[in-house]
């Protein structure tokens, strides 16, 4: 990759107050305005966190091929209306292909729920060999990146394809071949020298501190799982009895009052602790496109496929930029910045294979 030298590192939206930096382990350029003390009475309810946790509970499950997915009834009116607004990327492929003709395509993919099924144990979210083959074929035609909430090392270990670009921790840890001014050299798990872009690097000590404390705070809650993704920490409650959800939310919420430079976000059956910086999956897409020398191309067509709320930032970047489109992976109706939809990972695989088949035909017809 060639990284343009004028790329700016992430910045905070608000000015920085004076705080104990040794306690936080971060530099002043990543500080935000003073934390506003939340309401004392029933914090998690007043802030809507418990409602958000409950709303993420799936309607019902059924087995679709090799995937355990959330399913809404086919004859449900809301589902049909939703499909009109977010049509299937497979059924709409002719329209997508027409837009893609003579364009430079770049493909961005989430991992969990997109390339692998959502499962009770995150460690068992294994990508099938057929899906890996489909992704590898896509990467042989188009620049392809995985942007995951998992740590970069973990998602690389799960995918195992050297042809791809990897961004972990929701884009806060990007491995690149560029040696631009905002990147630094490191060594990967294979001992190879790589260049990394980590806009939240100063937060590593405080995230580790929060992770270790949350592990202790969740020990007595059956089914709770805490993970350290290096630049963010997550508390999974998919296997927790619903009566214990308020306890989890309250403990996490209360503990974070000590860390005004961290924020709490919500995903699919997971609470995530993240640095308060102006960076997300959408910014990661912009960075990768710039790194690839594609950001100012008029003939660019990025495609982003993801299933989580964190993918909405990437969908919005593509929609607001009026180029490319997002594809939401969901079998239940929900509002999104995406243009198209796919029901589950099996349909993602089918779409990727269709994209490769189209690319082969285009190559044969043009001779390039």
Swiss-Prot record:
Q: EC number(s) of the enzyme? A: 3.1.3.12
Pathway assignment reads: Glycan biosynthesis; trehalose biosynthesis
For this protein, the record's Gene3D superfamilies field holds:
HAD superfamily/HAD-like
According to the record, the residues making up region (Disordered) are 1-23
The GO terms this record gives for MF are: trehalose-phosphatase activity
Name the CDD domains on file.
HAD_TPP
Q: What cofactor is this protein dependent on? A: a divalent metal cation
What induces it, per record? Answer: By trehalose.
In terms of Pfam families, this protein maps to: Trehalose_PPase (PF02358)
Biological-process GO terms, alphabetical: trehalose biosynthetic process
The top EC class is hydrolase
InterPro entries, per this entry? HAD-like_sf (IPR036412), HAD-SF_hydro_IIB (IPR006379), HAD_sf (IPR023214), OTSB-like (IPR044651), Trehalose_PPase (IPR003337)
Catalyzed reaction equations = alpha,alpha-trehalose 6-phosphate + H2O = alpha,alpha-trehalose + phosphate
Cite the entry's keywords alphabetically. Hydrolase, Stress response
Entry similarity comment: Belongs to the trehalose phosphatase family.
Q: What does this protein do?
A: Removes the phosphate from trehalose 6-phosphate to produce free trehalose. Trehalose accumulation in plant may improve abiotic stress tolerance.
Protein name (database record):
Probable trehalose-phosphate phosphatase F
Q: Which organism is it from?
A: Arabidopsis thaliana
Q: Which gene encodes it?
A: TPPF
């Amino acid at each position: 990759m060639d990284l343009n030298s004028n790329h700016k590192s992430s910045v905070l939206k608000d000015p920085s107050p004076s705080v104990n930096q040794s306690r936080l382990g971060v530099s002043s350029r990543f500080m935000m305005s003073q934390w506003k003390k939340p309401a004392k009475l029933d914090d998690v309810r007043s802030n809507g966190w418990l409602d958000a946790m409950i709303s993420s509970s799936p309607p019902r499950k059924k087995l679709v091929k090799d995937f355990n997915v959330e399913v809404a009834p086919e004859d449900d009116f809301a589902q049909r209306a939703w499909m009109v607004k977010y049509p299937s990327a497979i059924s709409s492929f002719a329209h997508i292909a027409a837009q893609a003709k003579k364009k430079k395509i770049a493909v961005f993919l989430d991992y969990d729920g997109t390339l692998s099924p959502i499962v009770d144990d995150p460690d068992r979210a294994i990508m099938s060999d057929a899906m890996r083959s489909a992704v590898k074929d896509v990467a042989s035609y188009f620049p392809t990146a995985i942007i995951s909430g998992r740590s970069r090392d973990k998602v690389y270990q799960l995918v195992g394809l050297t042809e791809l670009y990897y961004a972990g921790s929701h884009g806060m840890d990007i491995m690149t071949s560029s040696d631009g001014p905002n990147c630094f050299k490191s060594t990967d798990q294979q001992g190879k020298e790589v260049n990394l872009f980590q806009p939240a690097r100063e937060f590593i000590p405080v995230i580790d501190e929060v992770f270790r404390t949350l592990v202790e705070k969740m020990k007595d809650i059956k089914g709770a799982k805490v993970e350290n993704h290096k630049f963010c920490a997550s508390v999974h409650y998919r296997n927790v009895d619903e009566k214990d959800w308020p306890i989890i939310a309250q403990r996490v919420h209360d503990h974070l009052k000590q860390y005004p430079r961290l924020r709490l976000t919500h995903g699919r059956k997971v609470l995530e602790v993240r640095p308060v910086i102006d960076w997300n999956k959408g910014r990661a897409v912009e960075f990768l496109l710039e790194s690839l020398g594609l950001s100012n191309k008029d003939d660019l067509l990025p495609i982003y496929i993801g299933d989580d709320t964190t993918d909405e930032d990437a969908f919005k970047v593509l929609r607001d930029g009026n180029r490319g489109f997002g594809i939401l992976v969901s079998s239940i109706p929900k509002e999104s910045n995406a243009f198209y939809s796919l029901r589950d990972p099996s349909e993602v695989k089918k779409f990727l294979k269709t994209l490769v088949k189209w690319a082969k035909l285009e190559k044969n017809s043009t001779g390039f």
